[in-house]
Design a protein with these regions (language model features):
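Helical hinge/lid and interdomain linker segments adjacent to catalytic or ligand-binding clefts
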Residues: 118-120
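Short beta-strand
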Residues: 155
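Bacterial N-terminal signal peptides
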Residues: 8-16
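Exported/periplasmic ABC-transporter solute-binding proteins
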Residues: 23-103, 108-115, 124-130, 138-139, ...
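Sec/Tat signal peptide C-region and signal peptidase I cleavage site
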Residues: 18-22
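Bacterial N-terminal signal peptides that target proteins for export
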Residues: 1-7
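A short alpha->loop->secondary-structure connector
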Residues: 151-152
Length: 327
């Protein structure tokens, strides 16, 4: 019966195509954000639900803007961990339940938002929400403390490393960073202008193949169109792979693990430690924060055993003093 229905549906679609009747395209899979289907929204009252994946969504802006008691600017490469982290924080601090707002766009763009007084525009919407805490790479956090944008000491909490994200089954048989220079491999790579991870990637390319490999990936392949530069790699790279626009892209290991966990057709190729680059994640209170006590509570929580156990689900490692890295 199912086979007959499928054949009937196919016949109807074929007739519609021949007659010029428009059809709603059938999605290849549920590949478009928000990948956690609203779990990263902390609002207690969501009102009217209107989210159309690929068309109308704000996947990296979370919570209720009305009167938040804690505002977090979080580097986007652990957007997926924020829902369980916030849930655990609220269990320990119930006064904050439903009152936390956070953004997970690239850290460099979050710095621009800090400097703009918290004002940001996405599509046709402009709003202002000033951060209480900023969380990104340790080097960036220390730099912002030096500039006076952040205050107090940096709080390091976890480390992460790079991987090569590919489509499920690894159809191009990519085994190493050197393979990224192959002419038959299309790449999605973070843009150094917007995304700090590009610096770590370029360092790893240098370890794997010297300046020649770096120039091939970020020079020749960009110039000939076989590499596209992303502006928000934690969204674009997996999407470009699933849409068969790219064959590979270097990302943080945690991002690939998350894609595998949610069942998207993504896998990853490990990069040897000798060629890899480690990032140390840290946070600090924003100077002049409207909710300084809340910021300090979050920074204390983020390195707690409960928070670290959540991070470890996605391949992060707890920060150990003296660990190499810092980006």
């Amino acid at each position: 019966m199912r086979a007959k229905l499928a054949l009937t549906a196919a016949a109807v679609l074929a007739m519609a195509a021949q007659s010029g009747v428009a059809q709603t395209p059938a999605p290849k899979a549920n590949i478009f954000p928000p990948w956690q289907h609203g779990a990263n929204n902390d609002a207690l009252n969501r009102g009217v639900e209107f989210t159309v994946p690929q068309i109308d969504d704000l996947a990296d802006f979370h919570g209720d803007l009305t009167d938040p008691k804690l505002v977090l600017y979080v580097g986007g490469n652990y957007f997926f961990a924020m829902a369980p982290l916030v849930q655990a924080f609220e269990a320990a601090h119930p006064d904050y339940k439903g009152r936390i707002y956070w953004e997970t766009i690239p850290p460099g763009l979050l710095v621009e938002q800090l400097k703009a007084g918290g004002r940001i525009t996405s599509g046709n919407m402009t709003w202002t929400v000033k951060a209480d805490a900023y969380l990104a790479g340790l080097r960036a956090v220390n730099g912002l403390i030096g500039q006076g944008l952040l205050t107090g000491a940096a709080t390091p909490y976890v480390t992460n490393k790079l991987t090569i994200m590919v489509r499920a089954g690894n159809p191009k048989h990519i085994t190493s960073l050197a393979d990224l220079a192959r002419p038959d491999v299309r790449l999605a790579m973070p843009n150094p202008e917007y995304e700090g991870v590009a610096r770590q990637i370029k360092a790893s390319l240098g370890k794997a193949g010297g300046d020649a490999l770096d120039k091939a990936v970020y020079g020749s392949k960009v110039a000939d169109g076989s590499a596209v530069l992303t502006r928000i790699h934690h969204r674009q790279t997996p999407l470009f792979l699933m849409q068969d626009v790219a064959d590979a892209g270097v990302t943080w290991q945690s991002e690939a693990i998350f894609q595998e966990q949610v069942g998207n057709p993504i896998t990853h190729v490990d990069i040897p430690d000798a060629q890899n680059t480690t990032a140390i994640y840290a946070g600090a209170e924003v100077a002049g924060a409207q909710h300084p006590q809340a910021a300090r509570a979050w920074l204390e929580f983020i390195r707690s055993p409960e928070a670290l156990s959540i991070f470890e689900r996605y391949g992060f490692k707890p920060y150990a003093p003296g660990a190499a890295g810092g980006d």
